[in-house]
Amino acid sequence: MSKKLHIKTWGCQMNEYDSSKMADLLGEYQGYTLTEEASEADILLLNTCSIREKAQEKVFHQLGRWKTLKDKNPNLIIGVGGCVASQEGKAIKDRAQCVDIIFGPQTLHRLPEMIEQVRRGDKAVIDISFPEIEKFDRLPEPRAEGPTAFVSIMEGCSKYCSFCVVPYTRGEEVSRPSDDIILEIAQLAEQGVREVNLLGQNVNAYRGATHDGAICTFAELLRFVAAIDGIDRIRFTTSHPIEFTQDIIDVYEDTPELVSFLHLPVQSGSDRILTAMKRGHMAIEYKSIIRRLRKAREGIQISSDFIIGFPGETKEDFADTMKLIEDIGFDHSFSFIYSARPGTPAADLPDNVDMEEKKQRLAILQDRITQQAMRYSRHMMGTVQRILVEGPSVKNPMELRGRTENNRVVNFEGQPKHIGTFVDVEIVDVYTNSLRGVFIRGEDEMDLRRSLRPAEILAKRKQDDELGVTQFKP
């Protein structure tokens, strides 16, 4: 009988990526296969997120449900990973005796050894250290699961925004060597991947070592990835405005593989609140980035993150945020009511914004951005859009589903042979969460390939006297 593994994942795309690597790791080295049913599993892993409110309580509620399974099967192994594990450590075991393993985002590669320790009789195995880049050296070779793939290029964050736990739970910024990233993406391309999404808490801070001892910037990495045969689309998430430098903007001007869509968190449009958040920039500097981006890539669409009701946020501060939303014309957002994260500087600030007021502000903000997104979608009516076909439509398996450059799902009638390829469709209808298209042409009628020598990429390296992001030019 095959051994079964069940993984429950909460949180960001980095967590989704980590969970997929856990499955690959335990599948390759210990023969486990994934199951959707926790009751069937020999190992239960909970990959946690500490961003949202009451994250710890959510973990213990889930562990309470899993305890009933362990009561029936004492050999069941339960592990808790992710950011809550890093934050709470041994306190998880103290409160939930059913837990056998506690591991952080940087130690998931040690899971096989930790499982063996439990089997040998250790009552609790805890490893929430930050061994820098060792994690990636121990993971199995990448395995494609469709035409799109996520690739982690760095870990951690060194910005220490006053509201954020990431530097404390994932450590400071550590970049993977550029050669390792390029090799991983090339291997994925050989397996049919056409679009990669480069992941990190702050990808534009990427500074990866090269084989010759130099440092590869994020802008250079983007160009190297674009030159990999078979990779026709590149996305990345997430970025920080203070390191969105001109050399990155220049890539949008000359690298068509980089999509015309950017997620760039701003959190607030109020300079006073941005200062309290320790974001390191003002609203005008954010607008300067977007202005230069739109000069480099006409029609690029922008999404962002917003925190509503940060301690001390006044009606005037919120009005500044709404003004920024109108000025930029955001296409999408992840927006949340502020909740204090234990151990962060903002947790000590008096939370003097009424909850009902926070809810009203959130509803107003989300309604405005939804209206703007629908306006963009309606402008796409009658246009021809190139989409990467990801598979059957979710609601109608007789149809196909693809995604535009600006991250919209398009459903259309097409042949199964188009899955994993690019097609052009005409947009004929607009819905709240998707578009409808009519097939126009397949990939065999397109010219998608281009080549670029490494020397040409390095020739674009920014000069020492290049102006940084904090310089505003009207």
UniProtKB/Swiss-Prot annotation:
Catalytic activity: N(6)-dimethylallyladenosine(37) in tRNA + (sulfur carrier)-SH + AH2 + 2 S-adenosyl-L-methionine = 2-methylsulfanyl-N(6)-dimethylallyladenosine(37) in tRNA + (sulfur carrier)-H + 5'-deoxyadenosine + L-methionine + A + S-adenosyl-L-homocysteine + 2 H(+)
InterPro entries with a match to the protein in the record: Elp3/MiaA/NifB-like_rSAM, Methylthiotransferase, Methylthiotransferase_CS, Methylthiotransferase_N, Methylthiotransferase_N_sf, MiaB_methiolase, rSAM, rSAM_horseshoe
Entry annotated with the keyword Zinc: no
Binding-site list for [4Fe-4S] cluster 1: 12, 49, 83
Positions of the MTTase N-terminal domain: 3-120
Binding positions for [4Fe-4S] cluster 2 per the UniProt entry: 157, 161, 164
UniProt entry tagged with the keyword Iron: yes
Cofactor: [4Fe-4S] cluster
Catalytic class of the enzyme: transferase
Cofactor note: Binds 2 [4Fe-4S] clusters. One cluster is coordinated with 3 cysteines and an exchangeable S-adenosyl-L-methionine.
Gene Ontology molecular function: any one: 4 iron, 4 sulfur cluster binding
A Pfam family reported for this protein in Swiss-Prot or TrEMBL: TRAM
Protein name per UniProt: tRNA-2-methylthio-N(6)-dimethylallyladenosine synthase
Gene that produces this protein: miaB
